[in-house]
Amino acid sequence: MHITLRRLDGLPSFRQQRVGKLLLALLREKNDERFQIVHFSIQTNHLHLIVEADNRDVVRRKMSGVTIAFAKRFNRLLGRRKGKVWDDRYHRRDIKSTRDMRNVLRYVFGNAKKHGLIPARAAILDGYSTAWLFAEWDRPLPRVVGGEHWPRPRPRTELLLYSCGVEGELIVTEAPRSS
């Protein structure tokens, strides 16, 4: 499934080094066998997750844990006792086919290009995503900008295991269309 989470306006960018590290540490902490974050993309004001979960109840509990824990730690980082961080609850979209999975991967990995953080047609992967861990690119792995290390994903579902084998490789220079 594809999960999106947006922060309120006026707060520091999620791509600032100290905020990004805080967010990555929390995502690592919440990642387990029942709720696996297979891929992600951290943007300035929002976050995309591609997850595999045992069921919707696990997703609800884990995402509640992510949002609450991040808000507390983020507020502490900003020197605030409390304060709203998230614009709304998370948005979840189930991925139903290999073509849909390929399109979601392209969108998530290319989101920094869509928002102008990386030149649109550049053969550069976003280091604030797991794009550099993805094996089905149309050419040898291009250079990565910024970011942190993430454990190599071990997808369990056929959609993640075979989507690009069925639908074709992702094109490094491709950027998602604006919505």
Over which residues does each language-model region extend?
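Short Pro-Cys-Gly-centered "Cys-loop" motif that presents a nucleophilic cysteine in a tight turn
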Residues: 1, 5-45, 52-179
